[in-house]
Every structure is written in structure tokens, then in C-alpha cells.
Regions:
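C-terminal and late-domain segments of enzyme folds
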Residues: 2-58, 70-85, 166, 170-315
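General beta-strand structural signal in soluble alpha/beta enzymes
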Residues: 35, 92-94, 118-119, 150-153, ...
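Catalytic-core regions built around general acid/base machinery
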Residues: 53, 109-113, 133-147
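Short internal beta-strands
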Residues: 61-67
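Portal/gating segments that form or line small-molecule/metal binding sites
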Residues: 69-113, 119, 126
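Catalytic nucleophile loop
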Residues: 118-121, 140-164
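Glycine/threonine-rich flexible loop motifs
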Residues: 124-134
């Protein structure tokens, strides 16, 4: 097993790494997902959300997976520097760039004992093809079930959904070809699909196209250096940008099947929302949590109603 590691004294080493025992967490029954739209700053709020969740600044162990990168070892070295800059000292990144490495029991054991597991960016299709269904994949799921925090940035975030999106970058007219849809790791449910670098790479049209073709899917477009922190069915937005959500269940007309031949997209009654930093998206209801709560309070008759009246007017 080839690996790249950092330790508490900041030095690196190559070779087999001995993993600690698996830690079962009794404070919660499932972990947290931190989904970052790419290009996260080492000391920014998006990556900071992951470090806080897995208590990395207080000795929590992080295991990184850089399989999505064209150069997993180079990416591992870069991430070790970024995590060190952020203040995380217990970070291990085993090099997994082939299927046989994803079946390595030593790497799986390392992952099972981690407080946080980090998926770097690159090619989400390659990541899922290499790791999906392997011992590493099963170890990630086991750790998540026991309360570990799973973080992905860019392709690493896109791969955590049930269905992944790749390719099909729009041209200046919003037209595209060669869209790829395939199975992901499925840790994020709710029939959600993630697109990253969303505002920065003008991917709104691409997400519209995919949702038009798959109207039951919930599209999530995450900006760079921005995270959607998901616990249960609630996702809080943290960082510099926003998260766009797209719900196609109410669409009345679209010509999505014609668009792959170069025709412009025509679409009506698509539901779109933008969630800024500090606000929470209810993934189950596909709505801002503040509005879900308001509806529930109104239905229960407990919502407050403030009315100012002119003097002498009876209430």
C-alpha cells in the first residue's frame, strides 16, 4: 500500500500506515455530510465547517481520498499542506488510484477509525468507478453510519449523491452535448444531484437541462468555497457563496429531448430557489426551512400575527 501522511509534527512519510481502532460514536446515530462546491480556501468557512464537525482542531483524525484527481499523490501532498495551514494535524491520505488499492484491508481499516473522511476533486466518474462497491466504499459507509463526517469538494461532493452529473459544459448559447449521468455513492439521498463550481462556471443551464430530463430529481448547484452541511434532512449553507436548488416536479412543458441535438432549451414552471450563507434548506420538502416552519406553525394555529391598528378601532 502506498500512502502519503501527515502527523502532529507536520512531517510526511511514505509506506504503510497503522490505523487506530474503530471509534463508535454514541452521541448520534449517523454522520454529517459537508458538500463543498470546489476551490475552498484552507482557512475559509466552507472547509472550516468540515474541520469543526470532525473536531480536527482538537485531535480528530481525517482520512483523505484523492482518487478523483489525475495525480492522486500530487493532490494528496497539496491537501496535506492545506489541512496543515487550516490547523488539522492528524491527517492521513492513502494513495488509491487503482481498483486493487480500493480493496486494501489496511486502507479500509484506516477509514473505519476516522472522525472525518475527505474526498478531493477531479473526475467523479473515475472516482466512483474505482472505489464504488469496494472495501474502501464499505468502510466509508460504516464510518458514516457510526457518526463520522464525510466531506467532498468538487467531484468529491458530486460523487456522494445517488446520481452523478458530468460533462456537458454549455457553450455561449447555453447549448451542450455529451452529458453523463451515472450512479454515485448515494450517501446523500432525497433524489438529489449536485453540480459544483456552479455560479463561477455558469452551470445553471446544465442543471436546468438535467432536471428537465429527470423531473423527480432535486438539483443542487453549489458555489465555490461554499458548503452545504447536511444533518438528517436539513442542509445549512456555509461560506462565501450560495446553493441553488432546482425542482422539476411541477414542470408543464420542456423540450429537453431535443436539446442534445443543439436546440435551445424551452422550459416552463420550473421551480428554482437560492439559499445564501446562514440559511437552511429542507431537503425533504425542497424548501427553505424557515418557510417549512412557518407553514407548520400556521397549520397548528400557533404562529404569531402582529397587527397595528389606528386608535379607536376595535380589535
Amino acid at each position: 500500500m502506498e500512502s502519503s501522511t501527515s502527523t502532529s509534527n507536520g512531517t510526511g512519510a511514505r509506506g504503510a500506515v497503522k490505523a487506530g481502532p474503530t471509534r463508535r460514536r454514541s452521541d448520534r446515530t449517523a454522520g454529517t455530510l459537508v458538500l463543498i462546491g470546489g476551490a475552498c480556501e484552507p482557512t475559509g468557512e466552507a472547509l472550516g465547517a468540515f474541520l469543526r464537525q470532525c473536531k480536527a482542531l482538537d485531535g480528530g483524525r481525517i482520512v483523505g481520498i484523492t482518487t478523483a484527481s489525475q495525480d492522486p499523490a500530487g493532490s494528496a501532498r497539496d491537501w496535506l499542506k492545506s489541512f496543515a495551514e487550516a490547523g488539522a494535524t492528524h491527517v492521513e491520505i492513502p494513495i488509491v488510484d487503482r481498483r486493487d488499492q480500493a480493496q486494501d484491508r489496511r486502507i479500509a481499516k484506516m477509514i473505519e477509525g476516522a472522525d472525518g473522511i475527505f474526498f478531493g476533486g477531479g473526475d467523479q466518474v473515475h472516482l466512483v468507478a474505482t472505489v464504488g462497491g469496494s472495501r474502501v466504499d464499505r468502510a466509508v459507509r460504516e464510518a458514516y453510519a457510526n457518526g463520522a463526517t464525510i466531506c467532498g469538494t468538487s467531484a468529491g461532493a458530486a460523487a456522494l449523491t445517488e446520481t452523478i452529473l458530468a460533462g456537458g459544459e454549455p457553450d455561449e448559447y447555453g447549448q451542450m452535448q455529451d452529458l453523463h449521468l451515472g450512479p454515485g455513492f448515494g450517501l446523500l439521498g432525497f433524489r438529489a444531484m449536485i453540480d459544483t463550481h456552479f455560479t463561477q462556471r455558469r452551470r445553471l443551464q446544465r442543471l436546468f437541462m438535467v432536471i428537465a430530463q429527470n423531473p423527480e430529481t432535486l438539483g443542487l448547484g453549489i458555489d465555490e468555497d461554499t458548503a452545504l452541511v447536511v444533518q438528517g434532512h436539513l442542509g445549512e449553507v456555509v461560506g462565501r457563496g450560495s446553493v441553488t436548488f432546482v425542482d422539476g416536479r411541477g414542470v408543464r412543458f420542456d423540450n429537453a429531448d431535443e436539446c442534445m441535438d443543439g436546440k435551445p432549451l424551452t422550459l416552463s414552471y420550473l421551480r428554482v430557489g437560492i439559499v445564501g450563507s446562514g440559511y437552511t434548506l429542507n431537503l425533504r420538502e425542497r424548501e427553505l426551512e424557515v418557510l417549512v416552519q412557518a407553514r407548520q406553525e400556521e397549520a397548528a394555529g400557533v404562529s404569531e400575527l402582529e397587527v397595528l391598528r389606528s386608535e379607536g378601532m376595535e380589535g
